[in-house]
Each structure stands twice: as C-alpha cells, then as structure tokens.
C-alpha cells in the first residue's frame, strides 16, 4: 500500500515496473517453457491498483494507457483474473470474499517488457488480501501467482532478486544497490511468445553474479558482462529498439539494455539529475515515446 492513494478508494497498492537488468535463456523444458536466469529489480514508477468494498463487482481503468488496455477487452485482464482466482481459493476455505470495486491506474505501456500486467496482478492479490482481511500461506500465494503468469511471483516480492526456472524460483538479492534509471519505450507492442519462438539458441551461458560487488560502480562493471538473450531477436522483429538504445547511449547512459522481451529499454545513469536531464532530452526528440526517469529498489549505503 502507498500514501497518496487513488481518490475514492479505501486502499491503493503500487504495481512497480519490473526491470530485467539481465536475462539469460539457459534451456528449454519438454513442455516448451524456456528456462531463465534473470537479475531483476523494481522501479519506483508503475501502475496503481485501488480497492474498495462495493455492492457488486466493478472494474474501472484510468491513466495514460487506459485506452490501450480497454482495447484488449476486460475478460483477459490480469487484475480480474487475480480477483477471481483468489476468491475461489478463499471460498474453498469457507471464507467470505465480497464484491469489490477494483480500479487500475494504467501508467505503464502495454506489452512493454517491464511486467505491467504481472505487477498489476500481484498488487491485486496483495490488495484483496488486505481488503478482505484474509491470509494465505506464502507457498499457496506464490502458487496462485504462478497460475497467473511466470512473472507474477517475483512481482509479489518487489525487491531485487534473481529469478530462475521459468521465473518462479526466486532468490532475494538484498545487497543490490539502487540505480538511477531512464525507461524508454517507443510505444510499439512486442509479443513475448513471438520473441521466444525467434530465439536461435535455446541454451546459452548462465548468469554469473559477482561475488564481492557492493557499490553501484562495481555492479555496473559486473552487469556489463551480462546479457539479455531476448534482445537480438527482439531487435530483428522491431528495429525501433535499436533507435531507443542509441537514444539512451547518446544521452550518456553508463549501461543500456532491453528489459524482458521489449520493447522497453533502460539506461543506467550516475545520479538522478543526470537521469532526469537525459529523460528531458529524449522526450524532446521523441515526444510520443514513453520516457521515465526513476530510481530502482535496492540497498543504499
């Protein structure tokens, strides 16, 4: 939950943007799911979910990208799927889960590689447990989250972590420092299944974490040797990703990489003022793009 909630709602829960600082594809299961090793953190920016008890279920949407979400149809929205899944789980335990008005403030682009839908689902699960005064064991909650998508369990965590398996094997990384970052998306949706199907190599070198890195500079050096194995096929599918990456480099980013399956790219900067100046420069040159200077979660000092 966060201060400065959505007006008219009893509770507001943040759904922060997920950033894959590195994403290595290391294999593929017999069922077709790819095995990943990913260094993940979360930004201060993101969507928000408002909740209040109601006489009937309602779902409303606002925010810059509300229209894009509505165009997809409410039936497939992860917020509603999370509500229905948790309600069934609680009903099976003989517990009440009354009608609720859910409101999604959609501030992140759709299909952008920064986990917007997964974060929305995770925030909905956390928010409904609070609104309904219910508890679910951590293992059961993670199981529910995984039914909604491979990224949802890590979005429940919201702290720096390493994700393995299909994304559900989570190891917290409390010593990862925060980073000043600029997120840029050219507002071109990228299909995750298409990018995975386009992978030429399904088995790539594993993610190697530094043993003694503590400072931001040490982590930047270590991350420079990491990869996003989805970036080459994503660039081939959507050449605009290269344009975005070049814009971040030209603006002075110390490290530039694509997040998830794209098309969002991030640039890491040495200080928030530098990040904000870069965001202003990129926005001036590309006023229709999504450009956001922000800071990530992490251990300061």
Curated annotation (Swiss-Prot):
One of its GO terms (biological process) is isopentenyl diphosphate biosynthetic process, methylerythritol 4-phosphate pathway. Keywords: ATP-binding, Isoprene biosynthesis, Kinase, Nucleotide-binding, Transferase. The active site is at 18, 151. It catalyses: 4-CDP-2-C-methyl-D-erythritol + ATP = 4-CDP-2-C-methyl-D-erythritol 2-phosphate + ADP + H(+). Its EC number is 2.7.1.148. Pathway: Isoprenoid biosynthesis; isopentenyl diphosphate biosynthesis via DXP pathway; isopentenyl diphosphate from 1-deoxy-D-xylulose 5-phosphate: step 3/6. InterPro entries: GHMP_kinase_C_dom (IPR013750), GHMP_kinase_C_sf (IPR036554), GHMP_kinase_N_dom (IPR006204), IspE (IPR004424), Ribosomal_Su5_D2-typ_SF (IPR020568), Ribsml_uS5_D2-typ_fold_subgr (IPR014721). Disulfide bonds: none annotated. GO terms for molecular function: 4-(cytidine 5'-diphospho)-2-C-methyl-D-erythritol kinase activity; ATP binding. ATP binds at residues 109-119. Catalyzes the phosphorylation of the position 2 hydroxy group of 4-diphosphocytidyl-2C-methyl-D-erythritol. Belongs to the GHMP kinase family. IspE subfamily. NCBIfam families: ispE, PRK14608.1. PANTHER family: 4-DIPHOSPHOCYTIDYL-2-C-METHYL-D-ERYTHRITOL KINASE, CHLOROPLASTIC. This is 4-diphosphocytidyl-2-C-methyl-D-erythritol kinase. The lineage of its organism: Bacteria, Pseudomonadati, Pseudomonadota, Alphaproteobacteria, Hyphomicrobiales.
């Amino acid at each position: 939950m966060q201060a400065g909630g959505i007006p008219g709602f009893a509770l507001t829960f943040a759904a922060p943007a997920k950033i894959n600082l590195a994403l290595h594809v290391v294999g593929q299961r017999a069922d077709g799911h790819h095995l990943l090793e990913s260094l993940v953190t979360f930004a201060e920016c993101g969507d928000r979910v408002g909740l209040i008890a109601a006489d009937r279920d309602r779902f409303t949407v606002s925010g810059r990208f509300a229209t894009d979400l509505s165009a997809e149809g409410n039936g497939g929205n992860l917020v509603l799927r999370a509500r229905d899944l948790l309600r069934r789980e609680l009903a099976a335990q003989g517990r009440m889960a009354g009608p609720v008005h859910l409101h999604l403030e959609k501030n992140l682009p759709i299909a952008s590689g920064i986990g917007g839908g997964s974060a929305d689902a995770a925030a909905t699960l956390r928010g409904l447990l609070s609104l309904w005064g219910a508890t679910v064991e951590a293992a059961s909650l993670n199981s529910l989250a995984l039914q909604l998508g491979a990224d949802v369990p890590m979005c429940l965590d919201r702290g720096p972590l390493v994700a393995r398996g299909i994304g559900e094997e989570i190891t917290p990384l409390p010593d990862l420092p925060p980073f000043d970052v600029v997120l840029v998306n050219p507002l071109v949706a990228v299909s995750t299944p298409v990018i995975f199907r386009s992978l030429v190599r399904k088995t790539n070198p594993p993610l190697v974490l530094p043993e003694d890195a503590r400072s931001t500079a040490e982590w930047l050096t270590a991350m420079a040797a990491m990869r996003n194995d989805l970036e080459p096929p994503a660039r081939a599918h959507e050449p605009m990703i290269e344009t975005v990456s070049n814009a971040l480099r030209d603006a002075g980013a110390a490290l530039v990489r694509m997040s998830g399956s794209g098309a969002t790219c991030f640039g890491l900067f040495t200080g928030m003022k530098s990040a904000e100046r870069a965001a202003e420069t990129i926005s001036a040159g590309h006023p229709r793009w999504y450009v956001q200077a922000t800071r990530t979660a992490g251990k300061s000092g």
